[in-house]
């Protein structure tokens, strides 16, 4: 049996210590994993504590060597070739606070595999003081769909007619809602289709969880991220996808559509194509095929 793990759960202190020990660099900002002490005098006790914990977990050898698989995953997360930043927000609790989950899908290109052959990607998800690293083979945008929905409420796709709004109009609507304008009045102002009104109202007035996704790449030593991101929103009326596109005049437009797995895969493909390195999965493009429809 292959004893190489494909996932590990660490404290954020464990993760920071491993990254420093192996020289992996810093973690992406989205994970918010930073130096756990502010006084150099605290370092000795911190290092001893981490070594004890990782040794008990079987991740640190008596010679002080970090488990090679875990070390490789952390290197991928700290210095990916391509990535998706994930910021999840859950329904507000009784005290008004929202549950927050942070994550990143980190991909390596070139050979297509990490050195321990567990996959070409690593998914890191942080919840409070714990962070989970999972090695995965990701070679198709459709493989990303269940990953992106992991922190959501797993609602079925909402049923409504797709519609689009200029991003600036949506931003203006948000401002009006925050200033106290009734939701119904704002929905009228936006001219939202009748079939979509209950869904839009559930987004703003009911319990919801959502993930905001931004893509990035490292090409020729330069880090680039997309100007805009896409969102997947789970509401009492179902799952809604909010995806960006650029109009002919250069203005960004947000399209609201039922959050089907296919639609999400297409949106991921479109978002990542905005980056300098183009299509992430050129051999696995997903698109609507109207060729078999009768005229």
From Swiss-Prot:
Transmembrane segments: none annotated. Keywords: Chaperone, Cytoplasm. The keyword Chaperone applies. It holds the Pfam family ESX-1_EspG. Its main location: cytoplasm. It is found in: Cytoplasm. Specific chaperone for cognate PE/PPE proteins. Plays an important role in preventing aggregation of PE/PPE dimers. Belongs to the EspG family. This is ESX-3 secretion-associated protein EspG3. The lineage of its organism: Bacteria, Bacillati, Actinomycetota, Actinomycetes, Mycobacteriales.
């Amino acid at each position: 049996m292959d004893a190489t793990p494909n996932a590990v759960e660490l404290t954020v202190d464990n993760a920071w210590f491993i990254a420093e020990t192996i020289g992996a660099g810093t973690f992406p900002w989205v994970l918010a994993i930073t130096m756990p002490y502010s006084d150099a005098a605290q370092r000795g006790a911190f290092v001893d504590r981490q070594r004890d914990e990782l040794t008990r977990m079987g991740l640190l050898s008596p010679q002080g060597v970090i488990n090679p698989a875990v070390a490789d995953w952390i290197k991928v997360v700290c210095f990916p070739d391509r990535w998706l930043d994930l910021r999840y927000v859950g329904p507000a609790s009784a005290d008004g606070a929202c549950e927050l989950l942070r994550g990143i899908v980190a991909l390596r290109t070139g050979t297509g595999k990490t050195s321990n052959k567990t996959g070409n990607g690593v998914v890191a998800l942080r919840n409070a003081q714990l962070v989970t690293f999972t090695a995965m083979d990701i070679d198709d945008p459709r493989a990303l769909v269940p990953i992106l929905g992991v922190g959501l409420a797993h609602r079925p796709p909402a049923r409504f007619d797709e519609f689009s709004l200029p991003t600036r109009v949506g931003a203006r609507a948000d401002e009006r809602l925050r200033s106290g304008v009734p939701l119904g009045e704002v929905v009228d102002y936006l001219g939202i289709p009748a079939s979509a009104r209950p869904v839009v109202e559930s987004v703003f007035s009911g319990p919801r969880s959502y993930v905001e996704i931004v893509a990035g790449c490292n090409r020729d030593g330069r880090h680039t991220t997309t100007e805009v991101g896409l969102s997947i929103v789970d509401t009492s009326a179902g799952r809604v996808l909010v995806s960006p596109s650029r109009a002919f005049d250069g203005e960004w437009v947000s399209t609201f559509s039922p959050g089907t797995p296919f639609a999400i895969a297409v949106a991921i493909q479109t978002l990542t194509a905005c980056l300098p390195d183009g299509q992430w999965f050129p051999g696995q493009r997903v698109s609507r095929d109207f060729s078999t429809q009768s005229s």
